[in-house]
């Protein structure tokens, strides 16, 4: 799990974002505003199968700024789509 988080963190680091993983939630925080979250099903990190690209999930759980993401989806932050374009695969678990 630490390798997975580290791999994603270093992917995001050049864009001055932080990634935290806790209780099945990935939080990507813009260091300027400290806003943003991105939810993934916890089971996707626990199984050993090939995972779908993370961009699949961003359509399911849009990253939001300053709003409740369950109520208002028009404020999705497009910058995060670029940051989350790399697929998460099971080779990070080894």
Swiss-Prot record:
InterPro entries to which the protein is assigned, alphabetical: Uncharacterised_Ycf15
Assigned keywords, A-Z: Chloroplast, Plastid
Gene Ontology cellular component annotations, sorted alphabetically: chloroplast
- Which coarse location class applies to the principal site listed for this UniProt protein? plastid
Q: Where in the cell is it found?
A: Plastid, Chloroplast
Q: Which family does it belong to?
A: Belongs to the ycf15 family.
Question: What's the protein called, per UniProt?
Answer: Putative uncharacterized protein ycf15
Organism, as annotated: Nandina domestica
């Amino acid at each position: 799990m630490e390798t997975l988080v580290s791999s994603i963190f270093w992917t995001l680091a050049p864009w001055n974002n932080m990634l935290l993983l806790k209780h099945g939630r990935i939080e990507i925080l813009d260091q300027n505003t400290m806003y943003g979250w991105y939810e993934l099903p916890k089971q996707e990190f626990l199984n050993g199968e090939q995972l779908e690209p993370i961009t699949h999930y961003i359509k399911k759980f849009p990253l939001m700024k300053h709003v409740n993401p369950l109520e208002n989806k028009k404020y999705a932050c497009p910058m995060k789509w670029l940051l989350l374009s790399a697929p998460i695969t099971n080779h990070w678990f080894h």
